[in-house]
């Protein structure tokens, strides 16, 4: 059995590029972002996240409130799931990594 984290692999270049791609949606002041909930920019960010999830082999669920749940099966069907949560939208003057770093870190 592998030690915890031994098989954890993060592609730093892909993570960085994904962050920068998302940052192009709704550019804000001083290098931040403005992807407020239910705006066109929020929808564009959600669409891009869906595309990345599809490429990673995830299935997607969306609840009545619009929360997205990306699910990827693990290699051990008896193992407990791992949950990671954050948000893709931002405050009006949100930072470039506001929420999205947690989302993409989980996907990575």
Task: Show which residues each predicted segment covers.
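Alpha-helical metal-binding/catalytic segments enriched in His/Glu/Asp
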Residues: 22, 84, 96-108
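General structural feature for long, well-ordered alpha-helical segments within catalytic domains
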Residues: 11-18, 41, 45-49, 80
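Glycine/charged-rich beta-loop-alpha catalytic/anionic-binding loops adjacent to active sites
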Residues: 80-93
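Short coil/turn connectors at secondary-structure junctions
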Residues: 56, 77-82
